[in-house]
Amino acid sequence: MTSREEILARLRNNRPHSTDYVLPSLPLLGERTATRQRFEENLKALGGQVLEQQEGEIFSEAIARCFPDEKVICSAVPEFDGTLRLENITSPQQADKVDVLVVRSPFGIVETGSVFLSEKELHHRNFVAHLTQHIVVLLSEKNL
């Protein structure tokens, strides 16, 4: 018997049985139960909130209801002007005054309760998202 065969034989003889060490079950991230409810639960676990417009309420009224004390509301969406347009911010010093940023996300990740924002949504002004106090993300349920 060669040394290689001897080593392999020892390994085979000393291998533990698979029943001795049962592997834990791992939840799959891509489960097919990707629902709005699951997204909201995961978002809340991260410290986020789901804000919905009340019946008959226009978007600007919903923002005013949710953020009554905030003065500088920056918008990156065409359906809401806010007090400042994101395109008009040219420096981080200007963004430092922003209380609320309103932006649209192309998709949300149900499994983690997070949303995707890129340079496109932030008009290449990513620093605004880091400096603002609150971010309102518009997200369609079909994009979860």
Which residues does each PLM region occupy?
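The feature marks the mature, well-folded catalytic cores of soluble enzymes
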Residues: 1-144
